Amino acid sequence: MDKTELAAYACAVRALSRREHCAAELRAKLGQRDYSDEVIATVIARLKTDGYLSEARFAEAFLRMRMQGGEAPWLAAQRARQRGADESALQDALAAAQDDFDALRVCRDLLLRRDPQGLRHENERIWQRQARFLRNKGFDAATILRCLKENLQDDVSIAED
């Protein structure tokens, strides 16, 4: 490796030390620093050989991070695709992530985090705002309705106590 390749390699390792990246992200970052396509290709091949760059690790870490933030798996996968993640690694990570994903529980947790005082949606405006919030997180209409209806029943039973 010449000096330019070593500098590009060091730059890529620094980026990977902060978080996992896919090859497309590293290509873009190295391209912004005006490294040639040949140098970038060499560095990415070396990173894969050395075990520093893994599309599977990126897909797993990215999906886990987005899902912990309350996103539905399909939306997290879509965002990973936009970043250039490898499709086969993404499909494997998505299959594993969906096994442990309980959409209804995540919806409830999101709403409780958003409104710790309780899930009060007795007026339609608040109910619609909560539904829109969950839809923007990638949840389907059936899950959203089920979550909001269950929480409405919980609120009514709490009010009766």
Indicate where each model-derived feature is located.
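An alpha-helical, amphipathic repeat domain used for nucleic-acid recognition
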Residues: 1-161
